[in-house]
Amino acid sequence: MRLLPRLLLLFLLAFPAAVLLRGGPGGSLALAQDPTEDEEIVEDSIIEDEDDEAEVEEDEPTDLAEDKEEEDVSSEPEASPSADTTILFVKGEDFPANNIVKFLVGFTNKGTEDFIVESLDASFRYPQDYQFYIQNFTALPLNTVVPPQRQATFEYSFIPAEPMGGRPFGLVINLNYKDLNGNVFQDAVFNQTVTVIEREDGLDGETIFMYMFLAGLGLLVVVGLHQLLESRKRKRPIQKVEMGTSSQNDVDMSWIPQETLNQINKASPRRQPRKRAQKRSVGSDE
């Protein structure tokens, strides 16, 4: 009987605890925690909104900077409609590295006011982005006044750097001038992609070997022709010319021994028939 109240007390203590752990109908603690979670969610959303506003504020300066850059680009001086320009490369549109490139720029004033041509400049740009400079050449100061309906010609020359040989670059040639009112103009006389040619200095090994090979081949041809002509001369037979024996002087006596010739010369010649007949006639008269 004493254990029964104790067991009942333990049951009363354990049952509510089990119900609370399982989330039963007496779950007031879980309901009490919901407001805190809602507060955390609200705080997170507020923080996210603040981050979005900060990102928007950060993006606005970049947009303003881009707008300023576009305004700067658009504010660059342009060519005047009252002027016309032409360009002529003296040696053609070939750009050898480490060699002088010369061209002439013609300026025509088609307006009614004077133009003051200030300078002429040239530069190599990156082919994919002409805003990126590779090599900037020295500007040529001109300060020349061109009256209305008149023309002027200007000469400019530059030397491409030797390491640029064999690569394409954007060549930009600008003519800067202004009118009497102070309005500044800039005309892109030439704005195209060109290729710098590698300069060939002297003779390379392949060229020298080719010349030596051709010289040796020519010498062999000459020697072969000479040997061919000599062999034909040797094979050609000697034509024997038959000489008559009409006179004694035409006979070749060199093959006869000298002793035999001496004996022939000592022998008395034969008498001719006429001399014998004359002697007989003289004897008959006697």
Swiss-Prot record:
Stored PANTHER family: TRANSLOCON-ASSOCIATED PROTEIN SUBUNIT ALPHA (PTHR12924:SF0), TRANSLOCON-ASSOCIATED PROTEIN, ALPHA SUBUNIT (PTHR12924)
Name recorded for this polypeptide: Translocon-associated protein subunit alpha
Disordered as annotated region, ranges: 46-83, 236-286
Further facts: Seems to bind calcium.
First and last residue of the signal peptide: 1-21
PTM annotation (Phosphothreonine): residues: T260
Biased composition regions of type Acidic residues, renumbered to the chain: 46-75
GN (gene name): Ssr1
Native organism taxonomy: Eukaryota, Metazoa, Chordata, Craniata, Vertebrata
The record's note on its domains: Shows a remarkable charge distribution with the N-terminus being highly negatively charged, and the cytoplasmic C-terminus positively charged.
The organism of origin for this protein: Mus musculus
Lumenal topological domain residue ranges: 22-207
Pfam families associated with the record: TRAP_alpha
Membrane topology annotation: Single-pass type I membrane protein
Family: Belongs to the TRAP-alpha family.
Stretches with biased composition (Polar residues): 244-266
